[in-house]
Curated annotation (Swiss-Prot):
It is found in: Carboxysome. One of its GO terms (cellular component) is carboxysome. Heterohexadecamer of 8 large chains and 8 small chains. The keyword tRNA processing does not apply. Mg(2+) binds at residues 193, 195-196. The basic functional RuBisCO is composed of a large chain homodimer in a 'head-to-tail' conformation. In form I RuBisCO this homodimer is arranged in a barrel-like tetramer with the small subunits forming a tetrameric 'cap' on each end of the 'barrel'. Substrate binds at residues 115, 165, 169, 287, 319, 371. It comes from Prochlorococcus marinus (strain MIT 9301). The active site is at residues 167, 286. It catalyses: 2 (2R)-3-phosphoglycerate + 2 H(+) = D-ribulose 1,5-bisphosphate + CO2 + H2O; D-ribulose 1,5-bisphosphate + O2 = 2-phosphoglycolate + (2R)-3-phosphoglycerate + 2 H(+). Gene3D superfamilies: Ribulose bisphosphate carboxylase, large subunit, C-terminal domain (3.20.20.110), RuBisCO large subunit, N-terminal domain (3.30.70.150). PANTHER family: RIBULOSE BISPHOSPHATE CARBOXYLASE (PTHR42704), RIBULOSE BISPHOSPHATE CARBOXYLASE LARGE CHAIN (PTHR42704:SF17). This is Ribulose bisphosphate carboxylase large chain. Its EC number is 4.1.1.39.
Length: 471
């Protein structure tokens, strides 16, 4: 060895705290919210995160002399206060692109949120945002189809897609499940959906469900003259079973399948997205288990990161919460990660939780899916928040209609078209929501009953995970 090797332990900040560093366009940038143990300097905590998520370990090792750590190491180049939290701070870290396998979200997350989250010097650690360089994005497959192609496949333009989750989500036989699908689609919905936890249980094996659903979709298409679909959940306990289910959906000439991307894993999701791209299949993505990871405001991974990772891994639709329904998520935060699903360039905007400029290049966009505790009274707000490139899914807000699922579907369709018409006429649909819906209900008894049924239903709970912005 030509260089002198000094054995022992040295402080992380001696190597990984580099405030003079100017990030390169090819660097992957990450923002962590850090809360260190009492008495540990911020610079040491931040440098430890940079080290343990890149090339570092707890001790100096002789094999460092066999490579160029200055080239490969992560660098903490900036520290910022967290508004309203004197114990926490933001650490901005730059990683050279060569640390990551091309196109592998699995590898990126293994590095950034691997062992470092169990580090004793930290009380809490949260990955708030990632700036993926365009050089990495170009190695990812991304959405197998994207918004434009999906609209062309479904022949739906000028409005959000309208759907619902089949309820009860567990317990129905395959035949009865297919009957509910048919009622919803003939009533006016574009799409129906398996819930995240319907796979292949004793009361309803997956092949039986697929066959009855396909029959229902095709019958509804013939009767309405519209393209219909159902998200067939292909999530399975093995990759082989996953692809067997996808292949059978293709044999049945179904337009769209579904995957639970967090419980299923990014490796499985990327593989399924590649299969969908090759086989002309749309891919709906559910985010089951996300709140375990993203809801704590000080520890875990923010959903904006999980949403960005999904766009790169591959999916044509992704659940994002509703703002107005039963699930966590404030308006500005939700708009922030919806932007990162759909836009080609998203500027840094702390008011929406975006810590970096994000250039997506020519990667197709992803439909934002609003689902969870929504009903017809929410329709104007949903249209205003999510816009046209979204899918609005009313589960209980369809099946809970006193006249049944078909009437619930009809009510939602009338409400949506009334709101789109009002918006296109220049009306302020959120401010005039009651007038717009009541006018439409004069010509739709289904909508009138729905408005009466859910007039008192609200989910007015404060958001747990709030944006860290200066008040």
């Amino acid at each position: 060895m030509s260089k002198k090797y000094d054995a022992g332990v040295k402080e992380y900040r001696d190597t990984y705290w580099t405030p003079e560093y100017v990030p390169l366009d090819t660097d992957l940038l990450a923002c962590f919210k850090c809360t260190g143990q009492e008495g540990v300097p911020r610079e040491e905590v931040a440098a430890a995160v940079a080290a343990e998520s890149s090339t570092g370990t707890w001790s100096t090792v002789w094999s460092e002399l066999l490579t160029d750590l200055e080239f490969y190491k992560g660098r903490c180049y900036r520290i910022e206060d967290v508004p309203g939290d004197p114990e926490a701070f933001y650490a901005f870290i730059a990683y050279p692109l060569d640390l990551f396998e091309e196109g592998s979200i699995t590898n990126v997350l293994t590095s950034l949120v691997g062992n470092v989250f169990g580090f004793k010097a930290l009380r809490h650690l949260r990955l708030e945002d990632i700036r993926f360089p365009i050089a990495f994005i170009k190695t990812c497959g991304g959405p197998p189809n994207g918004i434009v192609v999906e609209r062309d496949r479904l022949n739906k333009y000028g409005r959000p897609l309208l759907g619902c989750t089949i309820k009860p989500k567990l317990g129905l036989s395959g035949k009865n499940y297919g009957r509910v699908v048919y009622e919803c689609l003939r009533g006016g919905l574009d799409l129906t959906k398996d819930d995240e936890n319907i796979n292949s249980q004793p009361f309803q094996r997956w092949r039986e469900r697929f066959e009855f659903v396909a029959e229902a979709v095709k019958l509804a298409q013939r009767e309405t003259g519209e393209v219909k679909g159902h998200y067939l959940n292909c999530t399975a306990n093995t990759p082989e079973e996953l692809y067997e289910r996808a292949e059978f959906a293709k044999e049945l000439d179904m337009p769209i399948i579904m995957h639970d991307y967090i419980t299923g894993g990014f490796t499985a999701n990327t593989g399924l997205a590649n299969w969908c791209r090759k086989n002309g299949m749309l891919l709906h993505i559910h985010r089951a288990m996300h709140a375990v990871i993203d809801r704590h405001p000080k520890h875990g991974i923010h959903f904006r990161v999980l949403a960005k990772c999904l766009r790169l891994s591959g999916g044509d639709q992704l659940h994002t919460g509703t703002v107005v329904g039963k699930l966590e998520g404030d308006r500005q935060t939700t708009l922030g990660y919806i932007d990162n699903l759909r836009e080609s360039f998203v500027p840094e905007d702390r008011s929406r939780g975006n810590f970096f400029d994000q250039d997506w290049g020519s990667m197709p966009g992803v439909f934002a899916v609003a689902s969870g505790g929504i009903h017809v009274w929410h329709m104007p707000a949903l249209l205003a928040i999510f816009g046209d490139d979204s899918c609005l899914q009313f589960g209980g807000g369809t099946h809970g209609h006193p006249w049944g699922s078909a009437a619930g579907a009809a009510a939602n369709r009338v409400a949506l078209e009334a709101c789109v018409k009002a918006r296109n006429a220049g009306r302020e649909i959120e401010k005039e929501s009651r007038d717009i819906l009541m006018e439409a209900a004069k010509h739709s008894p289904e909508l009138a009953i729905a408005l009466e049924t859910w007039k008192e239903i609200k989910f007015e709970f404060d958001t747990v995970d709030k944006l860290d912005v200066q008040g």
